[in-house]
Regions:
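Short glycine-rich substrate-engagement loop in P-loop NTPases that contacts/grips substrate
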Residues: 49-80
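Walker A/P-loop
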Residues: 13-51, 75-79
Length: 258
C-alpha cells in the first residue's frame, strides 16, 4: 500500500494509475481476506470512489452462448464499478481452458473495462500460482495490466501461532500447559506428510494453510467432545485429544497415496 500511496501523492492529477492485481498462492493463505483490506485501503486513500468489494467466480461470467457471455460479463463489471472486483479461481477464465471462445469474450470485455475504468474499478484476480501464470499468458493484454503479488505458504510456526490464536479465541485450555509444546512438532509432521503425498490432481501442498489449522482444530474439538460426553474428564484439551485430531488429518494425507 505504500507504493499506492506514493503514486497518489506524487502523480499528476490527470494521470490515472492502474491498481489491478494478481493474488497468487495456495488456498488458505489469506488472499480473499487481504483483498478486502486492500479495497478498504484504496478507498481511504482516494484510489477508488466507494468502499465497495464485489466477489465473483469464473463460472459466473460464462453464460449460455458467446454473445450472452459478453453481456453477462458487462453486468458483473458494471455492478462492481466504484470499487474492487475480486475474481476467485480466475485461471478458469484462461483461453487455454475448456471454454476457449466463451473465455476469450470474457477476457476481451474485462480488459476493456480495466482500461476504460482506471479511476473507478480495481480488479483482483486470485488463484494458484502456476495456473495464474498460464492465465496471464493466455492473453497478451493481461500481463501489463496486473501487478503480481505472491502469497507464500504459512510456515510451521505460523500454523502453530494461528492454532493458538484460534484456541484462545474460543476459550479452550490445555489440561496441562506443557501440552502447548507438542503443537509445533505435530504440525511439522502433518505438513511434511502432506508435502510428500500429492492430492488427486498431483498438486503438492502443505494441506491448506489456514484451512489446515481449522481442520485440525475441529478434529481436536470433536475428540474432546466425544470424551467429555462419555463422562471422561473435563472440557480442557488432553494429550490424547490433540494427538487424535492430528492423527486424523495425517491419515487423510496418507490415504491420498493409496
Amino acid at each position: 500500500m505504500n507504493t499506492i500511496e506514493m503514486n497518489r501523492a506524487t502523480a499528476n492529477s490527470d494521470f490515472e494509475f492502474s491498481y489491478n492485481m494478481i493474488f497468487a498462492g495456495e488456498p488458505g493463505t489469506g488472499k480473499s481476506t487481504i483483498a478486502k483490506i486492500v479495497a478498504e485501503s484504496l478507498f481511504e486513500i482516494g484510489a477508488i470512489p466507494q468502499n465497495k468489494f464485489t466477489t465473483a467466480t469464473s463460472d459466473e461470467f460464462v453464460k449460455g452462448y458467446v454473445g450472452q457471455t459478453g453481456e453477462n460479463t458487462r453486468k458483473i463489471l458494471d455492478a462492481a464499478l466504484g470499487g474492487v472486483l475480486f475474481i476467485d479461481e480466475a485461471y478458469e477464465l484462461s483461453t487455454n481452458s475448456g471454454q476457449n471462445s466463451f473465455n476469450s469474450e470474457v477476457l476481451s470485455v474485462l480488459i476493456r473495462y480495466m482500461e476504460e475504468h482506471r479511476s473507478d474499478l480495481v480488479v483482483i484476480a486470485a488463484g494458484y500460482s502456476k495456473e495464474m501464470k498460464d492465465f496471464l499468458a493466455s492473453n497478451v493484454g493481461l500481463t501489463r495490466r496486473f501487478q503480481w503479488i505472491q502469497f507464500e505458504d504459512y510456515t510451521t510456526q505460523e500454523l502453530t501461532d494461528i492454532f493458538e490464536a484460534m484456541r484462545s479465541s474460543y476459550g479452550d485450555t490445555y489440561q496441562n500447559p506443557a501440552l502447548a509444546d507438542i503443537i509445533y512438532p505435530l504440525f511439522d509432521k502433518l505438513v511434511n506428510t502432506n508435502l510428500s503425498h500429492p492430492d488427486v490432481n498431483g498438486r503438492v501442498t502443505n494441506g491448506g494453510n489456514g484451512g489446515l489449522v481449522r481442520n485440525v482444530y475441529q478434529q481436536i474439538v470433536q475428540a474432546r467432545n466425544n470424551r467429555f460426553v462419555a463422562g471422561n474428564g473435563d472440557k480442557s484439551f488432553t494429550q490424547n485429544d490433540i494427538v487424535t485430531g492430528f492423527k486424523t488429518e495425517i491419515n487423510k494425507a496418507l490415504q491420498r497415496a493409496q
